[in-house]
């Protein structure tokens, strides 16, 4: 059951990324908030290359697949992100690119430090710590997706399918925490509960916006 849910989570997130890429190219906009994308890339880079999962070949394959798909999503941000900048007389396209790279670098440094520091919560198991960190960034991501939808006032770059696959992708592996198949701490369980709230809220808002033709 544990392996099945982990593979299911990996597969649903792969589908989510592919759908984001498709919708971004179709609508000519980016479909993932910059800070969320930076954290994603940093997590995938760190736990694929710096702290790779020992003996878990399927996990390595999934992490690398996520990483390369996120690079494509980063491309869509570079391609379409600047047109969403409101004060173009203050922020140039070049400065936006530089700012983006800096955020990604800082995010990678954070992940490297956090992987080591948070491992003490899980008997120095960095692999388990990576799951805790993933839930923290998933909460940030879930909030940012809701914020992006509300700020844009439309579903460009977003879809109900993205919202649902994203939610199930996170829920699949988090079931392991609630059923004690994987170790967890109380704070993490609270974070997971918050993720479910914001993911379901995002699905509801996407449905409402789509139904009212706010595209």
Predicted segments — roles?
Residues 1-13:
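Hydrophobic transmembrane alpha-helical segments in integral membrane proteins
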Residues 14-27, 44-97, 111-117, 206-210:
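Internal transmembrane alpha-helix with an interfacial aromatic "cap," most often the third helix
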Residues 25-37, 155-162:
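Membrane-interfacial loop-to-transmembrane alpha-helix junctions, especially the N-terminal start
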Residues 32-50, 63-66, 166-174:
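Hydrophobic alpha-helical transmembrane segments of multi-pass membrane proteins
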Residues 44-51, 106-120, 170-181:
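C-terminal ends of transmembrane alpha-helices
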Residues 52-57, 124-125, 181-185:
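Membrane-interface helix caps and helix-loop-helix hairpins in membrane proteins
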Residues 80-149:
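Membrane-proximal helix-loop-helix units in multi-pass membrane proteins
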Residues 144-148, 158-215:
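C-terminal transmembrane-bundle signature of multipass membrane proteins
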